[in-house]
Amino acid sequence: MPLYEHVFLARQDLAQTQVDGLAATATSIIEEKSGKVVKTEIWGLRNLAYRIQKNRKAYYIMLEIDAPADAIQELERQMALNEDVIRYMTVRVDAHEQGPSAMMRRGDRDRSNRSDRRRDRDAA
């Protein structure tokens, strides 16, 4: 089966449990169509480059999917109907990344850089 990465943005006013529920709903849609979600990453609440439907921030969720094309079509149809989802994009990939995605690695790097700067500042 083809491999996909599906990223969607959820409204900023949702609770974390609702965001987790959106990811679970997407997973169940894929599994109903005989596909599987290999990995789910919730990148958290992030600033948007521009306002989307009056939202300045959004929760980012990424799914790595191994599923047939009709499962992806149904997932995208459901995303378009869901009012909590403000944007989504699905991309076909040749292979899934091993380990955390680039966004998750960037967050770890940013945290370590901040702690290094703080340590240098305190030492001075």
From Swiss-Prot:
Q: Name one GO molecular function term.
A: small ribosomal subunit rRNA binding
Note one Pfam family from the annotation. Answer: Ribosomal_S6
Q: What Gene Ontology cellular component terms go with this record?
A: cytosolic small ribosomal subunit
Checking InterPro entries in the record gives: Ribosomal_bS6, Ribosomal_bS6_sf, Ribosomal_S6_plastid/chlpt, Transl_elong_EF1B/ribsomal_bS6
Asked whether the keyword Transmembrane is assigned, the reply is: no
According to the record, the residues making up region (Disordered) are 97-124
Q: Does the keyword Ribonucleoprotein apply?
A: yes
The protein's superkingdom reads Bacteria
Q: Which GO terms describe its biological process?
A: translation
* SUPFAM superfamilies attached to this UniProt entry: Ribosomal protein S6
Q: What does this protein do?
A: Binds together with bS18 to 16S ribosomal RNA.
The similarity annotation says: Belongs to the bacterial ribosomal protein bS6 family.
Q: What is this protein called?
A: Small ribosomal subunit protein bS6
Q: Which organism is it from?
A: Zymomonas mobilis subsp. mobilis (strain ATCC 31821 / ZM4 / CP4)
